Amino acid sequence: MREKYESLSATVLRDLAKSRGIKNTSTMKKADLVEAMLAEDAKKEKEKAAKESEKKQEQSAPSEKPERKRADSAESAKEGSKEGEREEASQDDTIKNLDSGITVNGILEVMQDGFGFIRSDNYLPGENDVYVSPSQIRKFNLKTGDIICGNTRIKTQQEKFSALLYITTINGYHPSVIQQRKNFEDLTPIFPNQRIRLERPGSSVAMRIVDLISPIGKGQRGMIVSQPKAGKTTLLKEIAKSVTASNPDMHLIILLIDERPEEVTDIKEAIEGDNVEVIYSTFDELPEHHKRVSEMVIERAKRLVEHHKDVMILLDSITRLARAYNLTVPPSGRTLSGGLDPAALHMPKRFFGAARNMREGGSLTVLATALVDTGSKMDDVVFEEFKGTGNMELVLDRKLSEKRVFPAIDIVKSGTRREDLLLDPDELEAVEIMRKAYNGMRADEAVENILNMFARTKNNKDYIAMVKKNRII
């Protein structure tokens, strides 16, 4: 019973205690309320035991009718069981009376003090947040990022937030399933070996090029390196559309940090689906806001991977995320060129480094954009720090976009590590022929030649056949 009482919030316990006739409940703390309830239970148990012992003594006296004695003992046992049932029923009735009938569904954020809140709007604090008690968090092994579905208790005038009365599902599963899950950190990371096809009927040439030059696998840690106005946001939108079309079961989270509000609306309207979430923090928000949103998103993705699901995060951009951490992190006393604190890179690296393919099942793919040649030394330092951490790079060239060559992909500099695990033997051979052919060319010439060849073919299969047949670009 102790566990049952501890799983309830203090206000629910207080109401239960009042209904049982316990006095001075308003001044009691939760621990005192639990003890008082247990003492009341013990008192009732003693009374019940005393009654039963009296009946036994009566039955032990010599009687002319043993049959009647058996009947009396059976009746007393029935009465005892009925009393227990009545107690449980009264507790259930009390919980039903406290139930507001309002169902809450949102993401949990566990605070440092042990309690938590269910956030509903854009993963951030709001007026409609619901309080979750520390006992509920401990009992069900809840973590930040879990999606909680349950009913709230009737809110009193003194309370600022509604409180969670009971939980029905966690991440769409029964609460008993959640306690058996493994931690994200305990899963085994391996190289991406399942390909995410970006080419689809009616897809742009950009997706066909990326599918061959820089193939993306489940669990890829990719970086889209771009100068301003090179078309990185358009490319991200194309990738998102291709992923939702080719992998509808994959959970897609688009995280926009320090972006323009109109771009947020554009992406929200352009990419829709059951497994698509667009989370944002626009440039007019505080750096703390950017930091909090990004941490909630990565925790949400980890919880999904723990359930062996495939998740993809499209982050725009990791440079601005690092800038936000640079403004919020306590100064370490050291400074890199451009005014960047080395301690500010820890959390963005944790975010980017969370991408991995799991041997036990599930994967987390992160594609992040990085800005270069912005005129800020800090942006270049951030890019250099992240350069060796990814296993896929897609480089966009502003010179190509200025010449109106789209997509402005620098094919020479773009590529994927261990692409042999993702490409077919025919595709691998065609890519090698292409790379050898344009090795001595200028970037714009190589891209224009390849675009002409892509324009002459309907799909990548025809393109590969043409490259293998001609042996030259």
Q: What spans do the regions from the language model cover?
A:
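Short flexible coil/turn linkers enriched for glycine and charged/polar residues
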Residues: 100-102, 110-114, 124-126, 142-146, ...
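N-terminal "pre-motor" subdomain/linker immediately upstream of P-loop NTPase catalytic cores
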Residues: 83-178
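P-loop NTP-binding catalytic core
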Residues: 154-224, 230
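Flexible glycine-/small-residue-rich
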Residues: 37, 108-112, 120-122, 134, ...
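Charged, low-complexity terminal tails
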Residues: 1-101, 123, 128
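P-loop NTPase nucleotide-binding module
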Residues: 202-259, 298
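Phosphate-interacting basic helix/loop segments used at nucleotide- and nucleic-acid interfaces
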Residues: 96-104, 205-209, 297-302, 351
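P-loop NTPase catalytic core
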Residues: 231, 240-243, 252-274, 278-473
